């Protein structure tokens, strides 16, 4: 885990820059994201995929009450990592912005326009005293009149578009997997398998009931939540692939030892 440098008093107000040009409260908010659940987003040739490991910590928790993926509009879905209460506020605001766009302009909001509106709100909370930044990162994705889009927003209000990305505590490991295995030609079905494969590398055991997953396909342009039964099938396929890779690695190691 990255160690935070002593702030020498410059972290007492959100509006004060340190001599190095840093806003420590924003960096602390990013730390909340780094401790959050891992979410993976993948843009495919026929749609987009979001998957989140909800990381259920107690068997007494009702799994159905823990949401990490939220439908914003018919064609837009978002995944969150960070403070749950902050997520609720921004998701509600995103839904409101989508509704207002339909009422004002008679059409659905684009994925990019919605992502920018949320980032504007996040950025404003880095400038005003008496408030704190949102300790939350969002993956906002969907299909609009342009094409499939996938955006990541961070607590500073920065907005970056990706082909595939991850947020949360498992981001470094998941990004290594995505960078090595992602292809722009992959289908949504292949994207779902890759997303769960990346999540499997960030946890000791990937449990289907702990996974939240959604897709949006080019054909229908509608958000579709993936059932636990379907996720279980994909998880089994993922672990078969992992076992095959481990067996191949063990075989190669044995051949090297012989040489």
UniProtKB/Swiss-Prot annotation:
InterPro entries: Ntn_hydrolases_N (IPR029055), Proteasome_alpha (IPR050115), Proteasome_alpha-type (IPR023332), Proteasome_asu_arc (IPR019982), Proteasome_asu_N (IPR000426), Proteasome_sua/b (IPR001353). GO terms for biological process: proteasomal protein catabolic process; ubiquitin-dependent protein catabolic process. Belongs to the peptidase T1A family. GO terms for cellular component: cytoplasm; proteasome core complex, alpha-subunit complex. It comes from Methanococcus maripaludis (strain C5 / ATCC BAA-1333). The gene is psmA. The formation of the proteasomal ATPase PAN-20S proteasome complex, via the docking of the C-termini of PAN into the intersubunit pockets in the alpha-rings, triggers opening of the gate for substrate entry. Interconversion between the open-gate and close-gate conformations leads to a dynamic regulation of the 20S proteasome proteolysis activity. This is Proteasome subunit alpha. Pfam families: Proteasome, Proteasome_A_N. PROSITE patterns: PROTEASOME_ALPHA_1, PROTEASOME_ALPHA_2. Component of the proteasome core, a large protease complex with broad specificity involved in protein degradation. It is found in: Cytoplasm. CDD domains: proteasome_alpha_archeal.
